[in-house]
Amino acid sequence: MKSALPSIFTLVIIAEFIIGNLSNGFIVLINCIDWVSKRELSSVDKLLIILAISRIGLIWEILVSWFLALHYLAIFVSGTGLRIMIFSWIVSNHFNLWLATILSIFYLLKIASFSSPAFLYLKWRVNKVILLILLGTLVFLFLNLIQINMHIKDWLDRYERNTTWNFSMSDFETFSVSVKFTMTMFSLTPFTVAFISFLLLIFSLQKHLQKMQLNYKGHRDPKTKVHTNALKIVISFLLFYASFFLCVLXSWISELYQNTVIYMLCETIGVFYPSSHSFLLILGNAKLRQAFLLVAAKVWAKR
């Protein structure tokens, strides 16, 4: 049974790979069709396109890394191969996390209501704010790449002195853990920002509901519904990313103790985040949801 586990986990990852490519590809396709037909596209739709493309890249990177780790482990001690695999993961994961966080900030600035002059200033210039944040995240990306490159250089310097390349797997796993730790520390910033956006959206919704009660209005007014939908999208991102973060932590421990089964399980669960969260974005967006239901109805009718 234990020998069959790698094959089972591989099948699950392939299924997640297919779901992720279909859901993210659907987001890109529908928005691009709308862009061509209307000659314009809203800021949130542009964010969704870039986020979906980054997730497609991340899913492909995870799948390639998975198969290389199972069948061509020697590539990870090659200087060029090691840098390509790790840097591609860093870049795709960086844009995946930060674009989802920027989407949370966009919902906050567009939907929430606060009387603070600073908030109103940002709200009136939301498109410029989003662009500046996106450009500012490149600083984190470059710092992350520099730090990881130092880890890689130290690793290669140690083992280039060993002409036989008979390295210890425990040493390589220690190197892998240090790399994952660095990447995760850089990932905490977007998660924290998204969590703050979530709390501010809740506070704004609470104030809005209190105002509606004072005016003797129901809770199903349009603004309440918009608040609720935005909260669902942000909290789904937080929950999915929290599970992804826990899987990374567990994979660290499993690598240190050389527990292959736990490591593969954590990696498989971790892929669920970029693969499935985009499907929730489709359901939370009126245009994408309508297009999805239309396609699903046509597919069902042909059965």
Swiss-Prot record:
GO terms for biological process: detection of chemical stimulus involved in sensory perception of bitter taste. The keyword Transmembrane helix applies. Residues 29-55, 107-128, 206-232, 283-303 are cytoplasmic. GO terms for cellular component: membrane; plasma membrane. InterPro entries: TAS2R (IPR007960). Gene3D superfamilies: Rhodopsin 7-helix transmembrane proteins. Glycans are attached at residues 162, 166. It is found in: Membrane. It comes from the Eukaryota. Receptor that may play a role in the perception of bitterness and is gustducin-linked. May play a role in sensing the chemical composition of the gastrointestinal content. The activity of this receptor may stimulate alpha gustducin, mediate PLC-beta-2 activation and lead to the gating of TRPM5. Keywords: G-protein coupled receptor, Glycoprotein, Membrane, Receptor, Sensory transduction, Taste, Transducer, Transmembrane, Transmembrane helix. This is Taste receptor type 2 member 13. SUPFAM superfamilies: Family A G protein-coupled receptor-like (SSF81321). The keyword Cytoplasm does not apply. The chain crosses the membrane at residues 8-28, 56-76, 86-106, 129-149, 185-205, 233-253, 262-282. CDD domains: 7tm_TAS2R13. Belongs to the G-protein coupled receptor T2R family. It is a multi-pass membrane protein. Most taste cells may be activated by a limited number of bitter compounds; individual taste cells can discriminate among bitter stimuli. GO terms for molecular function: bitter taste receptor activity; G protein-coupled receptor activity. Residues 1-7, 77-85, 150-184, 254-261 are extracellular.
